Amino acid sequence: MRIIFWGTPEYSVKSLEVLKKSDHEILAVITQPDKKRSRGNKLIASPVKQYAMKEGLPVFTPETLKKNDHFISLLKEFSCDLFVVIAYGKILPKKILDIPKYKSWNAHASLLPRWRGAAPIQWSILEGDDFTGVGIMRMEEGLDTGDVLVEKQIKIEKEDNLQTLTKKLSDLSSELLLKAISKIEQNKNKDINHLLKKQKDLQRKLKYARMINKSDYIIDWANNSTDIYRKINALYPRVSTTFKKKNLKIIKIKILTTDEIQNKNYKIVSDKFKPGYVIGLIENKGIIISTKTDPILLLEAKLEGKNISKQKQLLQQLNPLIGEKFSD
């Protein structure tokens, strides 16, 4: 099949790589324009562009898709069979979606219609979902509303964070794309509609995965410990608090149950403080912080100006005292 690939972040690279190594032909790659991503205002190409250029694939980075007749004419000249779209970063207008002979197809990182939208991986962890997955859908004008051709679910492990789950779903996307394209190719002279499942028939509750904003990255210690744990994993490694007026990124924590506190003879004073306070200091083990429910043990964090540090080193860097407050 003759394919034009649309994608931007690292998540998309695995699928492009797999397609490049397959029997299918990648005619061109469409990705977001280079952006200033580091100090010195240096322009950095997207991960997809970097891979495509390394492989000698034609790359296009349109600033806009609306009222861009020249670019639309260019797409039509390729006479491609499919558009494959994975985390491109912009909504494709219908007049672009309808260009390929066998339409445009998207790999979406959720079990649709649950978590339509921009941040499905983050929200599946934030909400404590037991399972997630990938669906390959035929694209239409609506936001992730298309009919599903193939899908597969995987379990979200308790220790999964944004990095680990993104890797699993990126790999799964590449696997399912090949299956989906094979089905499309096998039925290219037939009506494929009988192979598609409408999202309303998938018996899942519709939920939207809104974009993550700056305030989402701040820990509210008045939340319960489970919600704090999920936030740290879902938005890894960018969740933060403050301590002694310095920014502290929380990388990893452990929820301490009552039994564990008693069995390990941890001495804490949780009954004296509201959420967000240092309520225990364990030699060589770290800092215990109060929440709305169970206390948490700080395992890994990054103090501004420092590298990621573990428990003993954090004790030295922060020099905390019982009763000192986080997010001061």
From Swiss-Prot:
InterPro entries: Fmt, Formyl_trans_C, Formyl_transf_N, Formyl_transf_N_sf, Formyl_transferase-like_C_sf, Met-tRNA-FMT_N. One of its GO terms (cellular component) is cytosol. CDD domains: FMT_core_Met-tRNA-FMT_N. GO terms for molecular function: methionyl-tRNA formyltransferase activity. Gene3D superfamilies: 3.40.50.12230. It catalyses: L-methionyl-tRNA(fMet) + (6R)-10-formyltetrahydrofolate = N-formyl-L-methionyl-tRNA(fMet) + (6S)-5,6,7,8-tetrahydrofolate + H(+). (6S)-5,6,7,8-tetrahydrofolate binds at S110, L111, L112, P113. Coiled coil: none annotated. SUPFAM superfamilies: FMT C-terminal domain-like (SSF50486), Formyltransferase (SSF53328). Keywords: Protein biosynthesis, Transferase. Its EC number is 2.1.2.9. It holds the Pfam family Formyl_trans_N. It comes from the Bacteria. Attaches a formyl group to the free amino group of methionyl-tRNA(fMet). The formyl group appears to play a dual role in the initiator identity of N-formylmethionyl-tRNA by promoting its recognition by IF2 and preventing the misappropriation of this tRNA by the elongation apparatus. Belongs to the Fmt family. NCBIfam families: fmt. HAMAP family: Formyl_trans. This is Methionyl-tRNA formyltransferase. It comes from Prochlorococcus marinus (strain MIT 9515). The gene is fmt.
